[in-house]
Amino acid sequence: MPESSIGAGCLVAVGVGPGDPELLTLKGVRLLRQADVVITPRGDRSDSSIALSIVESHIDPARQQVLSRVFPMRQPAEQMAAAWREIADEIAGLVHEGKRVVFVTLGDPMFYSTYLYLEEELRSRYPEVPVSTVPGISSVYAAAGKAHLPLGIADDILSVVPSTLPDDRLQAALDLPGTVVLLKVYRSFERVRSLLQQRGLAQRAIFVRRLGLEGEKVIPDLSKVASEDLDYLSLILVRREVHNY
C-alpha cells in the first residue's frame, strides 16, 4: 500500500521534474506539504536553487524550514566528499530529532541526481535513517515529448550516455541502433557535434535546453546551436532509425 503521509523521523527524496512546476507529481506535492524541513541543492557557483523555484509555491515558510545546501560538483574529490558528509550529518541529526525531511532534486532522484551521493553517505554511515524516494519526470522523457521524438518503438534500443565519456565509448554508443540520449553536453558540445557530423547523424540530432524554464529551446539542427545556447541543463536526442507503421 502507498504511504498516505510521511512518518516522523525520516527522509524522502522527491524528484521535481525537469523544470515545469506543473510536472510535479501529486504524491511529491502531498509529501512536500507534510514536511517539517525541505532541503534544496544548489551548485557551488549559484546563489539560487532551481529545484526550490519549482516547488516553492507548495511550501509554507511560516511552518516549514527550508535549507539550501551547496553540492559542489567541480572541486577536488576530497572537498566534494567532505561536503556530502556534512550534509548527511545534518540530515541524520534532523531525522533523529523526529523531523520529516524532504530533499528535492531535479528530474528523478535515481537518475544522474545529486541526491545519489547523499544517499550513499546516509546508507553507509546512518543505516538506521529511514529513506524513501518519490520518482520525478526525467528531462529525457520531457525532451522527447517536446521534440515529438519517440525514444523507443518495438525492438529499438534506447541508450542514455553522459557526453563526458571518452570518444571511443561515445562512438560505440552512437553506433547502436535506435535512439541515443546524450546528457551533460554543456562542456563537451563541440566534441559531440563533431562526432555526430562524422557519422552523418547531425541532421538526426535535436538539441534541447532548459525544459520548462526561462530560456527553453528545442533546436533540430545542430549547426544552428550557438555558444550562447549552451546551458548546464541541456541534452541531445539522436534517433538513428525511422519506422513507418
PLM features: residue spans?
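Class I S-adenosyl-L-methionine
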Residues: 1-21, 26-28, 33-130, 193, ...
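A contiguous loop/helix-start segment that scaffolds small-molecule binding in enzyme catalytic cores
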Residues: 11, 174-245
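A polyampholytic, Gly/Pro-enriched intrinsically disordered region
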Residues: 83-93, 149-162, 224-235
